[in-house]
Curated annotation (Swiss-Prot):
Encoding gene per record: pth
Function statement: Hydrolyzes ribosome-free peptidyl-tRNAs (with 1 or more amino acids incorporated), which drop off the ribosome during protein synthesis, or as a result of ribosome stalling.
Family: Belongs to the PTH family.
UniProt key word Repressor: no
Chain positions recorded as tRNA binding sites: 15, 64, 66, 112
Protein name from the UniProt record: Peptidyl-tRNA hydrolase
Length: 188
């Protein structure tokens, strides 16, 4: 199964290492790990390569989180992919820091990036990989997700990226349930 992996985040150096940008962080990890580079077109960056006899396309939307869905008409047309190939990587404040959750389908919850994608696609029937960023419940949710990780939190998140960079490229229809078990039982 070819994979279209879209990591959500906000463009710009001021959002680097923020909780909301863990999707971008995982894409960046995969790019470095596989010696790739990102190419910029219109409203996203991408890298396209082969891994274990399948096509992998990595995407970072440049539309800001709340407009992430705007990229999909051009992405699906350019790469000849469908929703069945799609894996969205996104932050989740309902999961503890370092906990991951892979799902075949799901809702949008309070996540505006997922709402934008579901609105654009007209469906919530796409796979997603949630990366737990915790929630301190002391500040506004917006301020919390746009805040940078502390040094100790960032170390844990980098461990998550290392783990996920080994796991997600080999996801396919035959082993999706096994990957769910492996990824969902992990915690860093």
């Amino acid at each position: 199964m070819d994979l279209l992996i879209v990591g959500l985040g906000n463009p710009g150096s001021n959002f680097f290492h923020t909780r909301h940008n863990v999707g971008f962080g995982l894409i960046d990890k995969l790019v470095v790990k596989h010696g790739l580079s990102l190419k910029k077109v219109k409203n996203y960056e991408y890298s396209d390569f082969n891994f274990e006899n399948k096509r992998i396309v990595l995407i970072k939307p440049l539309t800001y989180m709340n407009l992430s869905g705007n990229i999909f008409p051009s992405v699906f047309a350019r790469f000849y992919m469908k929703m069945t190939n799609l894996l969205i990587v996104v932050d989740n404040v309902d999961l503890p820091l370092g906990k991951c959750k892979l799902r075949k389908v799901g809702g949008t919850s309070t996540h505006n990036g997922l709402r934008s994608i579901s609105g654009s696609l007209g469906s919530t029937k796409y796979s997603r990989l949630y990366i737990g960023v915790g929630n301190n419940n002391e500040s506004s949710l917006r301020d919390f997700v746009l805040a940078k990780f502390s040094d100790s939190e960032l170390k844990r998140i980098k461990n998550v990226f290392n783990f996920l960079s080994e796991e997600i490229l080999s996801i396919d229809e035959c082993n999706f349930e096994n990957k769910i078990a492996t990824i969902n039982s992990s915690s860093f």
